[in-house]
Regions:
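Short alpha-helical
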Residues: 2-6, 28, 70, 97, ...
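Alpha-helical elements of Rossmann-like donor-binding domains used by nucleotide-donor carbohydrate transfer enzymes
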Residues: 5-9, 28, 42, 46, ...
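A metal-dependent, Asp-based hydrolase signature
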Residues: 30-60
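Active-site neighborhood of HAD-like aspartate-dependent phosphohydrolases
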Residues: 1-26, 50-54, 160
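Asp-based, Mg2+/Mn2+-dependent phosphohydrolase catalytic module
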Residues: 95-96, 100-192
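Structured helix-beta-strand junction loops
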Residues: 27, 84-85, 111
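Short, acidic loop-to-helix structural element flanking the phosphoryl-transfer center
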Residues: 58-89, 100, 128
Length: 192
């Protein structure tokens, strides 16, 4: 998330990336916005106050809208190669502003059989009830599901619920991580 770097630039006293993630995931303002309980203006005002950011709401929202940078160019091919053999679901801590970009700019929701954006579901990772909600909605047991995420906190939470979980820090590490589990995914230029 580009926003982590930006938040640390705005306010270096926020600490390390892990410390900022812990604060972000536990933030009342983030939780309210990314579970659909508040609007973007109230969110911006609350984040600025909570994190002591030296910017106004307009500046924050202008940058926040672009924190998701892009979709990796091989993501569609990799997910398509998996979708023919596995049921794919996205669990995303997100908000209406970012989800609109995911759909409009990258058609991301179409790459999954099921989507569980937090602002629509009303739940957030790393909370156990988010994982449990998704498992119930899909009708599968935790030990029959694999969860991958770039955030260690979310991976540990998924494991605590009983899911198989892997931390994958960047897209290029995804196919090798899946291959270690016997799941072979194709990307352009790779043999399947």
């Amino acid at each position: 998330m580009a926003g982590v770097e930006r938040m640390l630039e705005w306010s270096p006293s926020l600490g390390t990336t892990d410390e900022l993630w812990r604060r972000w995931l536990g933030s009342p303002a983030v939780r309210a916005y990314e579970t659909g309980r508040t609007g973007r203006d109230a969110f911006a005002d609350a984040i600025i106050a909570e994190f002591g950011l030296p910017v106004d709401a307009e500046t924050f929202l202008g940058e926040f809208a672009w924190w998701p940078r892009s979709l990796h160019p091989d993501a569609g091919a990799l997910l398509a190669s998996l979708a023919s053999r596995y049921r794919l679901a996205s669990l995303s801590n997100t908000n209406e502003l970012h989800w609109h970009r995911f759909a409009r700019d990258w058609d991301l929701p179409a790459l999954f059989h099921h989507n569980f954006p937090s602002f629509m579901v009303g739940k957030l990772k790393p909370d156990a009830d988010y994982f449990e909600h998704v498992l119930d909605a899909l009708g599968i047991a935790a030990d029959r599901a694999l969860f991958v995420d770039d955030n260690r906190i979310n991976v540990e939470a998924a494991r605590a619920v009983g899911l198989h979980a892997r931390q994958v820090p960047r897209f290029e590490a995804l196919a090798p991580a899946l291959a270690e589990l016997g799941i072979h995914a194709a990307t352009p230029g790779s043999a399947r």
